[in-house]
Amino acid sequence: PSKTLLAVRATCFGTVALAFPLSAALVFGAGVDRHRAADTLSVIYCVGLILGVFAAFLPLPSLRAWTRAQRVESVALVFLGMSYATHLSWELGWLVLRDAIASNPNAPWAYAWWAYIDGGDARYAVGDTLLVAMELLSVTNGTVGAVALVRFLRSGRTSIGARLALGATAVVHLYSASLYYASELLEGLPNVGDGFIAVYIKFGLANALWVVAPLFVFRFVYAGLEGVMRDGRKSWLV
């Protein structure tokens, strides 16, 4: 693996992870305006995740020998790992604590969710049935995917059964994200704040990865199936 690529991704994802507690500290410890802090956090979040996921396509000297298939696989696996981590942390946390989060908008511990609720999507402060159902689906998908990803890596990236399971979770990612967008857009964005950051960054770009990146996962799965058919492997579910 490319050490430079690992460093770029560690920087991107690490910055995103640190931005949440730092933003909360600035808001509740230094008196920074919560909406401005949330806007800045959303930009860091979007840039960090997108750059981290697609870093394999950067013109890094250490990646010059990489094939397009290797780059696609790298994007797919990193996206899936990041997505499962998000499902089993932020989204699972919201499902378990949603009533407490809604009741404590000024609590530092709840800021990780309110930074998105403030302008991004007020449905997370209400917890309507459709949103709860989508998040339950996401958490379930994340659990299944995490198990499949571990199995795939432990097999030396040879398990076609695990690869297919990863592809199945990408289908759910695409479906859930599309439903999330459509359910709000068709209503005229009643739960999204005004302004460029709220509409195009918090609501739009922050969720765009789950619409675009699954296409790379599908290509990664297809490449694995092509290899099986070419090699004539019989134990393809291993």
Positions of predicted regions on the chain:
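Terminal transmembrane helical module of multi-pass membrane proteins
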Residues: 195-238
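Alpha-helical transmembrane segments in multipass membrane proteins, preferentially the mid-helix core
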Residues: 140-158, 217-220
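Transmembrane alpha-helix/helix-exit interface in multi-pass inner-membrane proteins
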Residues: 84-112
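Membrane-lumen (extracellular) interface motif
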Residues: 4-8, 23-45, 61-72, 96-100, ...
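A loop-to-helix transmembrane entry motif
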Residues: 126-142
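Interfacial segments of alpha-helical transmembrane regions
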Residues: 66-88, 150, 157-172
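N-terminal membrane topogenic signal
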Residues: 1-16
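Hydrophobic cores of alpha-helical transmembrane segments in multi-pass inner/ER membrane proteins
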Residues: 46-59, 144, 206-220
